[in-house]
């Protein structure tokens, strides 16, 4: 069975877990969101490379307009330093693992569609309220990214 390390990056905390390919959470933890890009990547790389389990990849759930294909983040979010660098290149080089990344609201919606309250639903509207506010739209079982990767985002809002 394949295992993955998944990071859910938020404006306040980064939650991470070792997850099996069937969605079972093997273990989980969190740490405070770093204040700069160097610490951001250092935390992810150290936790990945020091993992006891054999990993098949890294999954990143990130705020902003996440370009899953090119490995970058546009737009704005509670963590302004994450916009610009190529996450896939940096993390693959440092860990020798495949990296997948997606917008955090899209990840939450996909998780609920896979194993949660929206299981077996084809059309979903999902709202996330945390340090920021975001949303996701799943239409006919697929994430609607929109022309500029803002398909489910109804505004740029940061909450206190």
Describe the residue ranges of each PLM region.
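Conserved phosphate-binding loops in N-terminal lobes of ATP-dependent enzymes
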Residues: 4-62, 69
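Small-residue (primarily alanine) positions within well-ordered alpha-helices
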Residues: 6, 59, 109, 135-136
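Generic beta-strand structural signal
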Residues: 9, 66-68, 129, 138
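A generic "binding-loop/recognition-motif" signal
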Residues: 12, 105-106, 150
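Hydrophobic "anchor" residues
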Residues: 25, 73, 143-144
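Glycine-rich phosphate-binding loop and adjoining helix at the ATP-binding site
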Residues: 34, 38-45, 54-58, 67-123
